[in-house]
Amino acid sequence: MAKKILVIDDSALMRRVISDIINESDEYEVVAIAKDGLEGLDMIVSHPYEYSAIILDINMPKLNGLELLKRLQKDHIEQTVIVVSTVAKEGAKETIQALEYGAFDFVTKPENYLETKSIDFKNKIFNMLNVATNSRSSLRRVSMRTGSASSVRSTGTFRKPEDSSKPFFAS
């Protein structure tokens, strides 16, 4: 069964391009699309365990990607979010903030339509989906075996639990 992906982007072209790329694979399927952060947040809240990963734009109307990430973090909603950023430089402030707010990783959005068709862009999307969804599955298996589900989060970064001096997968 294909892993379910939610795409949140205000650009109809990017929604279509990303959906087409993902749907080329038998492993993933775009099952929902949102045209802004508010619509995306509603989808996530109403179906919190529906999506294996979310591909999110930063610059959007109503609720931008950073605000959406902050809301997910504040409300303790566990999701694997990959940011597809319009920011040209990888070290840009918005991208760093997205990672701080819980994004799994990011891909720089192509500057023109021809670049969206490049093998490099497709590979970046698939590589991130593979790493993100496999990390999430591995962490869930660990939490099931150890009974520490509340300490395990989907991003796979390390954090020390308050009641232990040993590192544990969390974010």
Protein language model regions, located:
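Strand-loop microenvironment adjacent to phosphate/nucleotide-handling motifs in alpha/beta enzyme folds
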Residues: 1-171
